[in-house]
Curated annotation (Swiss-Prot):
One of its GO terms (biological process) is SOS response. Residues 12-89 form the GIY-YIG domain. InterPro entries: GIY-YIG_endonuc, GIY-YIG_endonuc_sf, GIY-YIG_UvrC_Cho, RuvA_2-like, UVR_dom, UVR_dom_sf, UvrABC_protein_C, UvrC. Keywords: Cytoplasm, DNA damage, DNA excision, DNA repair, Excision nuclease, SOS response. It is found in: Cytoplasm. GO terms for cellular component: cytoplasm; excinuclease repair complex. It comes from Desulforudis audaxviator (strain MP104C). One of its GO terms (molecular function) is DNA binding. Gene3D superfamilies: 5' to 3' exonuclease, C-terminal subdomain (1.10.150.20), GIY-YIG endonuclease (3.40.1440.10), UVR domain (4.10.860.10), UvrC, RNAse H endonuclease domain (3.30.420.340). This is UvrABC system protein C. NCBIfam families: PRK00558.1-5, uvrC. The keyword Cytoplasm applies. PANTHER family: UVRABC SYSTEM PROTEIN C, UVRC/OXIDOREDUCTASE.
Length: 614
């Protein structure tokens, strides 16, 4: 039966409808108060280009009746998440957004990043816009609250870890920690994450005063230091509301079919966080439709829902329904409000300013796409390169030669993909060509090895560090560096990878098999992108070489100390990677390093106390 004919038999009841394509794939999911009337409207009367395209690809349509409109909204949200239909407004890659997990169901809870939310009794906070944002939050929390980092499930009496000795963990592994005290600290972490900062500060102050009254002066001092640290962090947060309200403030940036929603999280009257989340499929949709779709997807997964959400535009007929659904999820009233004046309107303007910046960023990303397309045309590539790798060598008269690899993905630096290499074959001899050949060969040899391990199931692609191959390799230099890189690729069987060189002075691009530079039009975006990649590789190489020299200097100093052999040197350098960190270490921190004892720690401590600071 044709879809238009099938719709005539739909019930006049609330529910959800699905449009399916030729392969049975879900093209669109929607909800309706009356399934018959809503779906029939797609096949009659005037239609937008997008609806016309949807109907043209539709080979079947089905409906699911629900008991109420609110049930339809919930089902619609679940189906959009499951199928990610092409014609719906969807959060871009919403499955990959990270969350912060607090394992409150464990005897001694932990905090860490996760991308899954099983019903395991844990508390989840997010979604966050990136893993880096979660890691930064975890780092801050562990600085304020000494939670454990280990994955142990049984806590028997054993020697505490280094984190315990340096005050970064209470040490439940030792079996000496009061579970109630640890639990109380976890509650303080939850207060911090929920934005209940005034309650947190008051609670810490009360505990400090109680400890002092009970003559527990050491405990009182610990609480005093913790209270000061919390207050210092909170002092850096902007007060954006004179009251102590909790609310989210939303604004929308648009660029063609893409959108970006800014979410300002205000907790206890302070700006706690700013999230930027991407949407796709927004062309020919009003701001109200886009924001309504966003609310249903974002708050479906959100760990916390505030009592008020400020919007830049009203959502129309869906506003009341979405507010009701949010109230059910929060288990308390939620107000969706479009302020026209006053302080709340100023908050929306602040979010809109952030949205304007997001719009500029989206335009940059579009420009980067154009630059990559131009790069493919200029260099004769089959398609625009998504992953670019830049290589450079740095040394000081041949000493401590290092090589680096930097990565651009979709035209932007991806620092998490950067890699460093200590050159082995030409150690002590200044030979940049040989060093370049070695670095490129080692990088692609690792890719080959990891590919085999992944294929046999002995390594997951998530844990691999070199298996992703570039669409283009760029080396800093001229024909000599290009030949060296090409040799490294041939050695490892990757000669098919496109490789080019870019000189510094004349800004000329050289390609294998041609003696003259590749012609590039003046003001070329492609050339600008390659220059950016080359300069970033050079910067990273210089920084890496500087850090290497610093480590070597530290190793040389440790060699002068009696009782500090190779094993202890390695352990000390792992625990204290810089000279300043080692000089600032206390005797207890030094003694807590694996393989160290009190006598060796005293020797290191005395040596650096007598060494003048430069």
């Amino acid at each position: 039966m044709e879809p238009a004919e099938k719709v005539k038999h739909f019930p006049d009841k609330p529910g959800v409808y699905l449009f399916r394509g030729a392969r049975g794939e879900v093209l669109y999911v929607g909800k309706a108060v009356s399934l018959k009337n809503r779906v029939r409207s797609y096949f009659t009367g005037a239609r937008s280009d997008k609806v016309q395209a949807l109907v043209g690809k539709t080979r079947d349509v089905e409906c699911l009746v629900t008991g109420s409109e609110i049930e339809a909204l919930i089902l619609e949200s679940n189906l959009i998440k499951e199928h990610r239909p092409r014609y719906n407004v969807v959060l871009k890659d919403d499955k990959s957004y990270p969350y912060l997990k607090v394992t409150v169901q464990e005897e001694y809870p932990r905090i860490f990043l996760t991308r899954a939310q099983p019903r395991d009794g844990a508390r989840y906070f997010g979604p966050y816009p990136s893993a880096a944002a979660v890691h930064e939050t975890v780092r801050l929390l562990k600085k304020l609250f000494p939670l454990r980092s280990c994955r142990q499930t049984r806590f028997r009496q054993q020697r505490p870890c280094l984190n315990h000795h340096i005050g970064r963990c209470l040490g439940p592994c030792s079996g000496t920690v009061d579970p109630e005290r640890y639990r109380a600290m976890v509650q303080e972490v939850l207060l911090f994450l929920e934005g209940r900062h005034a309650d947190l500060v008051r609670g810490l102050a009360r505990k400090m005063e109680a400890a002092a009254a009970n003559l527990e002066f050491e405990r009182a001092a610990e609480l005093r230091d913790q209270l000061r640290a919390v207050e210092q962090v909170l002092a850096r947060q902007s007060i954006v509301s004179p009251g102590r309200e909790d609310r989210d403030v939303l604004a929308l940036a648009r660029d063609g079919n893409r959108g970006r929603v800014i979410v300002l999280e205000i907790r206890d009257g302070k700006l706690l966080g700013r999230h930027s989340l991407d949407l796709q499929g927004i062309a020919e949709r009003s701001d109200a439709e886009v924001l309504a779709a966003f609310l249903k997807q974002y708050y479906r997964e959100a760990g916390l829902i505030p009592p008020e959400v400020l919007l830049p535009v009203p959502l129309g007929e869906e506003q009341g329904l979405i507010a009701e659904w949010l109230g059910l999820r929060r288990q308390g009233r939620v107000r969706l409000h479009v302020p026209r004046r006053g302080r709340k309107r100023e908050l929306v303007r602040l979010a809109e300013q952030n949205a304007a910046e997001a719009r500029a960023q989206m335009e940059f990303e579009r420009d980067a796409g154009e630059a990559l397309a131009e790069l493919a045309a200029v260099l004769g590539l089959d398609q625009a390169p998504a992953r670019l790798e830049g290589y450079d060598i740095s040394n000081l008269q041949g000493a401590q030669t290092v090589g680096v690899m930097v990565v651009f993905e979709d035209g932007r630096p991806a620092p998490g993909e950067y890699r460093q290499f200590r050159v082995r074959e030409t150690a002590g001899t200044p030979n940049d060509f040989a060093a370049m050949r070695e670095v490129v060969a080692r990088r692609f040899a690792r890719a080959r090895e990891e590919g085999k391990l992944i294929a046999t199931g002995r390594l997951s692609s998530r844990d691999a560090r070199f298996h992703r191959l570039p669409d283009l390799v760029l080396v800093d230099g001229g024909k000599g560096q290009l030949s060296a890189a090409l040799e490294g690729l041939r050695e490892t069987g990757f000669e098919a990878v496109p490789v080019f060189a870019l000189t510094k002075e004349e800004e000329k691009i050289f390609a294998p098999g041609r003696s003259d530079p590749v012609p590039v039009p003046p003001g070329s975006q492609a050339l600008f992108l390659l220059q950016h990649l080359r300069d970033e590789a050079h910067r990273f190489a210089v920084d890496t070489h500087r850090r290497t020299r610093s480590r070597e200097s530290l190793r040389s100093l440790l060699e002068e100390i009696d009782g500090i052999g190779p094993a202890r040197r390695r352990a000390l350098q792992k625990a204290f990677p810089s000279l300043d960190a080692l000089k600032g270490a206390t005797l207890a921190e030094l003694a807590a390093v694996p393989s160290m004892n009190r006598k060796a720690a005293q020797a290191v401590y005395d040596y650096f106390q007598d060494t003048p600071t430069e």
